[in-house]
């Protein structure tokens, strides 16, 4: 080694740290996703290599997509493939904890494949050069890296004799297949699918080659690489073609292909020319799950209603705007279209506020999504919602869609408005003072002996879900009024007033009121209020979760019947519980046409709220099943509780039925043993 001046070492340390530190930012995330795609393909190639003798017996040439399908359905080979999937995070899971639940008895193939994947995710392809070959900054006596992942590009973290630096490896492409030819062919099939073809150069690899196919796309009239999405892996195949069924009209697609074997890859081909489907884009889907989010009362007695809906997941063209029509109805008969009122909201917005509606009235709302394709407007089917602003009729709301029967409205916030002023109790106009929203409650004294009152105020619900439990405040006053302070915007409150002494004839009186939204209040009063906390309504989360999932099995006359039971946690339910959704799935690696290993054959059933047991007949012996239970409420689904169970073996002389059948979860019998 050459002796260096002390100052040079410091300068080298600073420079190396700057240029070879851990990569960060969007580019690093893209590189990490690319490395993971290559690693899973190397993992798959290894599994095929281990079975190459068997594969050759079935196929004249193992470089055929049938070889991958064969491996997916072969007992040992499918176990090897299981860790190669991209659906699990190796950093958060140990190989033992991943493989044992799937293969409790024999998991050697899974474990060795998992350890190989773990190794290649941390160690880049190629070999470190000899320490004495390091030169320039790579020869600096510094510890600038600890792992290959800290080095950019293809560089590896290598020793130089007195430290570790990022260095260009040797034998980078030893045994690695050549890149495919960059020209890709696109064939649009009559079914609407797209077939992408490529060809390979002379293959120097004796191991099976996995082709990783990625794509990106942009929306618009013209192709654009600047506005394109990130590259996403759409297929891994051993064939030199892939057929894609999720091609959308109006998108400009680009593809690239990499050839990978167990030793590594030379990277992707250059991005292909742009491809766009010749199909015309479809009209947007009709808005779904239209519902009432909130109803609030105005000072003049009118009512504001907030309507919300679910945005479509992936239309051919993004929704440009929504048309909202509403009209007063009589006995659910809609008035003529000429008298309908209309609003337009932006495409990304999923709610609208209908202002100035009359109390104790029926209304019908129609909603339609609109997209633009050049000069053409594409419109969805209309969906409608019938609702009432009268409190007595709040449970009679109906949701209808064109050509579909009415569905029950999921109403997370019960329809409410300010009650008619009672004889004794009234609510004043909300006002803003001392940086607080306040309101005055006042009442009439009917007895001169009443000189002290209890005032209970209860926060019932808020549109923005900012309630800290159910906040209840009790105060005493000698006056015939009380100013309620520190109120929240867009919330429903209940106020109850009763005499401090129970001997009085004055009975407890209650009144409901709804505070205005921050933005509406600010606009009317011109107050300087910070409305940053007011957001688009977020429905209260369902916190209730099934617990203590257990299973027992009864074997009778060659049939296995499973009894699954659970308990419910004592979480606060913001909405009434309507039942349970139970999904059970067979986790299998058996040979099934067009199926992947660990494919899930699932069935689902809705149980009433008082049913905590599910009975499933005709289960398969010695099979792993996944049970998933969710609490259902009027406001949505709770978090799922998932557990794996394995059915017992059948005695050798007993036949078994190989198919799952629909069942009815009744007549639960206590099982002999639990799992």
From Swiss-Prot:
Q: Where is the composition biased (Basic residues)?
A: 656-669
Task: Extract one GO BP annotation from the record.
Answer: neuron differentiation
Instruction: Show which residues constitute the signal peptide.
Output: 1-21
Per the UniProt annotation, where are the glycans attached?
Answer: 65, 203, 294, 465, 548, 559
Q: Which cysteines are joined by disulfide bonds?
A: 43-77, 47-71, 80-99, 84-95, 110-114
Which residue stretches belong to region Disordered? 388-413, 654-675
The GO terms describing molecular function are: serine-type endopeptidase inhibitor activity
Per the database record, which ranges form the Fibronectin type-III domain? 180-281, 286-392, 418-515, 545-652
One GO cellular component term: cell surface
The portions of this protein that span the membrane are none
Q: Name one Pfam family in it.
A: Cys_box
| Primary location | other
Give expression by tissue.
Mainly expressed in neurons of the central nervous system during the second half of embryonic life. Expressed in mitral neurons of the olfactory bulbs, striatal neurons, Purkinje cells of the cerebellum, retinal neurons and neurons of the brainstem and spinal cord.
Q: Which PANTHER family is this protein grouped with?
A: ANOSMIN, ANOSMIN-1
Q: What is this protein called?
A: Anosmin-1
Protein species of origin: Gallus gallus (Chicken)
